[in-house]
């Protein structure tokens, strides 16, 4: 069952200006060390950060909170599987919120899709509750 859906659109040029103006202070407030390392290795640094920004916004919407109620930017982070597929990792209050909205007997799965077409970066997040597998008899 679908528990939440969120989407967000971020402007890459605006992200580039924000990074130039606020630099490390902004990066450290919003992005995890893993996200920063990923972005700084990429040719399109601002685009990488913009996609992750959009993912955090979309995830907060899918959680039904937006960025309020104690949620922190770094409670939501984007990592990549070896295949390159992006995945959301939730910690802190975001993880608590996810647990509270997941029905008993289910596990939550957070799906994320990222895309960009300069100057736009977009993220789409779907939170799904899957029934837990019954233990083997």
UniProtKB/Swiss-Prot annotation:
Its EC number is 2.7.8.7. It comes from the Bacteria. The keyword Electron transport does not apply. InterPro entries: 4-PPantetheinyl_Trfase_dom (IPR008278), 4-PPantetheinyl_Trfase_dom_sf (IPR037143), ACPS (IPR002582), Ppantetheine-prot_Trfase_dom (IPR004568). It comes from Cereibacter sphaeroides (strain ATCC 17029 / ATH 2.4.9). Keywords: Cytoplasm, Fatty acid biosynthesis, Fatty acid metabolism, Lipid biosynthesis, Lipid metabolism, Magnesium, Metal-binding, Transferase. GO terms for cellular component: cytoplasm. Transfers the 4'-phosphopantetheine moiety from coenzyme A to a Ser of acyl-carrier-protein. Its cofactor is Mg(2+). It is found in: Cytoplasm. The keyword Acetylation does not apply. This is Holo-[acyl-carrier-protein] synthase. Signal peptide: none annotated. It holds the Pfam family ACPS. It is an enzyme of class 2 (transferase). Belongs to the P-Pant transferase superfamily. AcpS family. The gene is acpS. Mg(2+) binds at residues 8, 57.
